[in-house]
Amino acid sequence: MYAKRAKEIFDEEIHELEKLRDSINTTFDQVVEVLYHCQGKVVMMGIGKTGIIAHKMAASFASTGTPSIFVNAAEAVHGDLGMINGKDVAVLVSNSGSTNEILNIVDPLHRLGCTIVAMTGNLDSPLAQRADYALSIHVDEEACPLGIAPTTSTTATLLMGDALMV
């Protein structure tokens, strides 16, 4: 019974990931070029569950030799922006694209001269509109039947991060 449900969850997530894969466009190419030519470090930022994924992304980029750090978006405006400069590329991860903690750091990052890449499930969001580049991590449905735990969206974010890294 549980094994059957587990397979259904796999199938649901795979279906959403295939749709996301098919939506990848030339913006992805542009972001890869920006990351490749970054003269500073790649700064991954997020909060909550997307922050956990962004932290993993920073660690993976660092594993491949790309200078990368994670900065919690909520801490950024309380002094942690001091470790960021205009040579850095900031990757802001927010499924909704309207999280206040993320939006509050966009203007300070622009003032520092950072290139901003948004990874969001909503390309019409304030974050996507204010970023230099916006990558979709949109999924139509979460695998969580209650709709309260990010499941498919975090998997999609993790996979997009891995695709950027390798």
Language model features with spans:
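An N-terminal, well-structured beta->alpha segment
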Residues: 1-40
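Glycine-rich phosphate-binding loops that contact phosphosugars or nucleotide phosphates
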Residues: 40-166
